[in-house]
């Protein structure tokens, strides 16, 4: 069969942006010369009307009348400022208004200031003075060009695909009143607020008479109030930070009912006390209009043209569509310029021959984005290194080019063609590349999260005799042990058999070198926990250059985990925490071992609650976790663990004693704190390290942002994660906390604190996350300190109410006293003496019977009374000797019932099981009924023996460790089913073969 030529069309698209780049020189939108403000500010104070640092927000503008500030604004180009239209109602405002850029102190005349007049004002045509919060935006054209320096930079306008979600933390700035009708500040203030869901905001606003709002707004604030923008802040920016650092003008301060009022119960408040979230004009939704003003508002600006005849497409807004006949062209206007290629039943091949787009680490300034026809992002490209031979396994793709207004480049040139779908093997992720020249590769969708269940391949061919160097610029893949989840594997042969290395996690890998002229790269993802992926460049190097690097000691070494202890004594992590989202509404997986003080507390082999390491022998947790689980030998502390389903660190600790606070009340949850002393000291390293305790008088300011970590942070109704999660939560005022829990017995006491956000919905108080540490970064010291322990109501339902934490500072003296009495065995747990708060009956353990009794001091096979366990569903047996007996003839069991017994011996002892009798009907014995013995009691228990086995009844089974599980699986009721088993504890020297048929089993 002859080969068909499937080249449906080839066209040169060249986008050139014209204009003089001179005025923009030195501009870098959204980048603060002082660096990111989030590292410590988010973790110390997210709100609070505090003074900003001079130069921290170099795009902030002060509009003045007769030398006095009246509104704010934001610099977005060398000659444009965005502000609120309602600030400009006076028809003569252009005559007296002065624009101050680089302003910080309203009294001092600073060298950083630049002052301009306004030559033109462009208000949105839909702005209506009678409804001032709708379309409340205006563009000011300055009478000169701003000189950019370290104190003056423009903010980034939002991209069409920027996403800022409810709960994301953004900052608003201004010189407005510090309180409602209060004084004006002298220097620039900053207030961090979470984005509020638009539907919730509109619902709140509906309770305010006379307010008419549209969907062209952004809402931000706390339902409890306390922090907000205020009078004089109008027109100022609401800036949100992209994941990669640049600040985006998300909104303009427009309106609010009062300043910092609570709005969570507006319906029940009189009108003069009603509040609202802060209302900001949504710049992204009005980006088309804003862009058109920035394009047309420059005098003598060369207008750009669009021409298909000469193959050059220029202009900031347009769409080029190739229909079935690829030479049939239409052009339509849209918010973002773009081109669509439709190649029916074929695979699209894009070959860039030129790329010159403003370079940015995450391609957020100017970029070319490639999408599928369903708007699934394939990749974003910028800089001057063209991607090579991009094969996209979709027949229809869309190319969108976006440019801000700061740095002009020549654009890009690409050829597209259609190839047979089977010309290259399908990668399963939408792209496959065979590369013959030096260049750059990146994961699909980068820098946004890559897709699930993807299999991507790149094959790089270097010149004969050369080696290939792969240099990573960015790297963030789901971390996992041995990189078994998401991973990037690098090989040095076509068959992908000679592996160089496999990578995952968040650490930037060292450069990778092949020792052949071929490098094969595989990128594989599973179904969950996606991240932003990677970007890397590859170059061809000679073998001689590698030899020279090796001699000079410049060859990279494999990344090895450091296990040396930190110089600090507490509160420092060698693995820095990473927050993908600047949000108080999102739970995300923690970087493994980034919270090295977090530990799992396990009872009878199962994780039951969390704790925090505070010393080599001590764990801090809640009394509610340990009160009804009274047997020390059943407890296990597992530090340094990230995934509950995978083996953690080898320092699992046995428990010496458990000490709940003597005043703990299960009715009020007051004094909910406990200490666990380990039998042996922990050895601190990078995975296991203590958290710092606060001072006795340490207090957190309201709205301080702290972090809670744990395995159940996604809420009671959500699937629990086996991997450690983290979440940023704000500290609430005592009054706001009490308002959420009016019905709580005993109220919110001085020994409790509230953290998180809530909608005020009903919440069944629970302890799903009991014991999880609430830690805060102390800005001055740069260390983490534990201020709270999750007590109850923490994430029982998603965001329903703030969680209640035990405040640690009031208990510092008690903690120190207990820890100083190291040799004393405290008897707070299970103490027969009256409880200081009155006699408290132990709460029932749902679905489990714990057979109480102390461990024998001598060999358990000595003559003692035989303990008979008659319960069935989930029984923990700690007393020896004992008997398990079950008779369906004398009990009424429903169809499908199941039973489980867990026998736990003291440490260093094993268990002897003697099966006396097993009987059942002949018919059920063939198919259904059985009795199974497992080694161990956790989810990782292993099958040991299954009964009935005629030759083993009667018979003896010896355990290998100190615990076994006996199960009777679900089955239909068998009136003849029953068994009798006796057990006893022994030292290891007394064990026989693991399964021995008995000729005489009269003794257990």
UniProtKB/Swiss-Prot annotation:
CDD domains: CUB, Tryp_SPc. SMART domains: CUB (SM00042), Tryp_SPc (SM00020). Gene3D superfamilies: Spermadhesin, CUB domain, Trypsin-like serine proteases. Ca(2+) binds at residue 113. Keywords: Calcium, Disulfide bond, Glycoprotein, Hydrolase, Metal-binding, Protease, Repeat, Secreted, Serine protease, Signal, Zymogen. It is an enzyme of class 3 (hydrolase). The catalytically inactive 110 kDa form is processed both N- and C-terminally to give rise to the 66 kDa catalytically active form. Specifically expressed in the pars recta oviduct. Disulfide bonds join 71-87, 170-240, 201-219, 230-259, 363-382, 429-456, 483-504, 609-625, 706-776, 737-754, 766-796. Residues 309-419, 429-541 form the CUB domain. GO terms for cellular component: extracellular region. Residues 20-45, 584-1004 form a propeptide. The active site is at residues 86, 136, 234. It catalyses: Preferential cleavage at 371-Gly-Ser-Arg-|-Trp-374 of glycoprotein gp43 in Xenopus laevis coelemic egg envelope to yield gp41. It holds the Pfam family CUB. Residues 547-566 are annotated as: Disordered. It is found in: Secreted. GO terms for biological process: proteolysis. Its EC number is 3.4.21.120. Residues 1-19 form the signal peptide. Residues 547-558 have a biased composition (Polar residues). Converts the glycoprotein envelope surrounding the egg from an unfertilizable to a fertilizable form during its transit through the pars recta portion of the oviduct by selectively hydrolyzing the envelope glycoprotein gp43. The egg envelope is converted to a sperm-penetrable form, via an increase in sperm binding. PANTHER family: ACROSIN-RELATED (PTHR24252), OVOCHYMASE 1 (PTHR24252:SF18). Belongs to the peptidase S1 family. This is Ovochymase-2. It comes from Xenopus laevis (African clawed frog).
């Amino acid at each position: 069969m002859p080969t068909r030529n499937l080249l449906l069309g080839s066209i040169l698209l060249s986008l050139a942006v014209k204009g003089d780049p001179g005025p923009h020189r030195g501009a870098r939108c959204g980048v603060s010369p002082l660096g990111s403000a989030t590292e410590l500010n988010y973790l110390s104070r997210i709100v609070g009307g505090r003074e900003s640092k001079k130069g921290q927000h170099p795009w902030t503008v002060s509009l003045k009348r007769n030398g006095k500030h009246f509104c704010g604004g934001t610099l977005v180009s060398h000659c444009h400022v965005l502000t609120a239209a309602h600030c400009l109602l006076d028809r003569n405002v252009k005559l007296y208004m002065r624009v101050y850029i680089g302003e910080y102190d309203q009294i001092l005349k600073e060298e950083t200031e630049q002052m301009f007049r306004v030559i033109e004002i462009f208000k949105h045509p839909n702005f209506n003075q009678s409804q001032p919060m709708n379309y409340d935006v205006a563009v000011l054209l300055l009478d000169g060009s701003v000189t950019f320096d370290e104190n003056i930079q423009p903010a980034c306008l939002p991209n069409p695909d920027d996403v800022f979600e409810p709960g994301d933390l953004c900052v608003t700035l201004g010189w407005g009143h510090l309180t409602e009708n209060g004084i004006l500040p002298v220097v620039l203030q900053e207030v961090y607020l979470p984005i509020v869901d638009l539907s919730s905001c509109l619902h709140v606003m509906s309770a305010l008479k006379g307010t008419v709002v549209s969907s062209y707004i952004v809402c931000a604030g706390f339902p409890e109030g306390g922090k907000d923008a205020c009078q004089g802040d109008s027109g100022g920016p609401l800036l949100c930070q992209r994941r990669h650092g640049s600040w985006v003008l998300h909104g303009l301060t427009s309106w609010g009912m009062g300043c910092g009022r609570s709005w969570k119960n507006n319906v029940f408040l009189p009108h003069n006390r009603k509040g609202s979230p802060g209302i900001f004009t949504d710049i992204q939704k009005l980006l088309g209009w804003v862009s058109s003003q920035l394009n047309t508002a420059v005098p003598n600006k060369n207008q750009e043209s669009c021409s298909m005849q000469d193959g050059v497409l220029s202009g900031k807004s347009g769409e080029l569509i190739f229909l079935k006949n690829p030479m049939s062209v239409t052009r339509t206007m849209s918010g973002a310029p773009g081109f669509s290629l439709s190649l029916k039943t074929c695979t699209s091949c894009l070959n860039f021959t030129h790329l010159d787009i403003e370079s940015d680490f995450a391609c957020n300034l100017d970029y070319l984005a490639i999408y599928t026809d369903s708007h699934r992002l394939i990749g974003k490209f910028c800089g001057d290194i063209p991607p090579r031979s991009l094969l996209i396994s979709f027949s229809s793709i869309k190319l969108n080019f976006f440019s801000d207004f700061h740095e002009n480049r020549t654009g890009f040139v690409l050829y597209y063609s259609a190839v047979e779908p089977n010309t290259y093997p399908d990668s399963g992720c939408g792209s496959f590349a065979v590369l013959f020249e030096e260049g750059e590769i990146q994961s699909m969708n980068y820098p946004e999260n890559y897709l699930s269940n993807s299999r991507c391949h790149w094959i790089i061919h270097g010149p004969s005799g050369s080696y290939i160097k792969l240099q990573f610029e960015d790297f963030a893949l789901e971390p996992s042990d041995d990189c078994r989840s998401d991973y990037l594997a690098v090989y040095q042969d076509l068959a992908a058999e000679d592996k160089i290395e496999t990578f995952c996690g968040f650490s930037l890998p060292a450069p990778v070198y092949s020792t052949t002229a071929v490098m094969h790269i595989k990128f594989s993802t599973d179904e969950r926990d996606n991240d932003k992926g990677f970007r890397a460049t590859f170059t061809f190097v000679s073998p001689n250059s590698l030899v020279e690097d090796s001699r000079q000691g410049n060859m990279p070494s494999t990344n090895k985990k450091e296990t040396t202890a930190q110089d600090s004594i507490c509160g420092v992590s060698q693995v820095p925490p990473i927050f993908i989202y600047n949000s108080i509404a999102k739970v995300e997986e923690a970087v493994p071992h980034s919270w090295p003080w977090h530990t799992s507390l396990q009872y009878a082999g199962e994780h039951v609650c969390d704790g925090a390491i505070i010393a080599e022998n001590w764990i801090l947790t809640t009394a509610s976790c340990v009160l009804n689980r009274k047997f020390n030998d059943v407890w296990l502390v597992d530090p340094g663990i990230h995934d509950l389903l995978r083996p953690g660190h080898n320092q699992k600790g046995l428990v010496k004693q458990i000490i709940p606070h003597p005043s703990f009340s299960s009715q009020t949850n007051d004094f909910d704190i406990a200490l666990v002393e380990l039998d042996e000291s922990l050895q601190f390293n990078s995975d296991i390290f203590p958290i710092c305790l606060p001072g006795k008088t340490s207090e957190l300011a309201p709205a301080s942002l702290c972090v809670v970590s744990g395995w159940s942070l996604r809420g009671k109704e959500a699937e629990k994660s086996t991997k450690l999660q983290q979440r940023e939560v704000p500290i609430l005022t005592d009054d706001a906390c009490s308002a959420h829990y009016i019905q709580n017995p005993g109220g919110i006491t001085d020994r409790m604190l509230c953290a998180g956000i809530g909608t005020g919905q009903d919440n069944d108080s629970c302890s799903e996350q009991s014991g999880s540490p609430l830690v805060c970064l102390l800005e001055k010291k740069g260390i983490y300190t534990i201020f709270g322990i999750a007590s109850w109501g923490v994430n029982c339902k998603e965001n329903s109410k703030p969680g209640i934490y035990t405040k640690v500072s009031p208990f510092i003296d008690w903690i120190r006293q207990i820890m100083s009495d190291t040799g004393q065995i405290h008897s707070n747990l299970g103490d027969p003496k009256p409880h200081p708060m009155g006699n408290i009956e132990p709460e029932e353990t749902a679905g489990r019977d714990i057979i109480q009794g102390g461990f024998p001091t001598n060999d358990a096979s000595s003559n003692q009374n035989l303990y008979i366990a008659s319960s069935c569903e989930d029984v923990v047996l700690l007393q020896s000797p004992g008997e398990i007996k079950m008779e369906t003839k004398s009990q009424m069991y429903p169809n499908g019932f199941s039973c489980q017994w867990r026998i736990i011996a003291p440490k260093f002892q094993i268990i002897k099981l003697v099966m006396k009798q097993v009987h059942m009907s002949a018919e059920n014995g063939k198919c259904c009924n059985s009795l199974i013995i497992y080694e161990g009691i956790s989810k990782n228990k292993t099958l040991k023996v299954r009964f009935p086995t005629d030759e083993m009844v009667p018979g003896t089974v010896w355990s290998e460790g100190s615990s076994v599980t006996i199960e009777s699986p679900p089955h239909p009721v068998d009136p003849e089913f029953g068994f009798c088993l006796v057990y006893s504890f022994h030292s290891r020297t007394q064990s026989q073969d693991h399964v021995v048929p008995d000729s005489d089993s009269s003794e257990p």
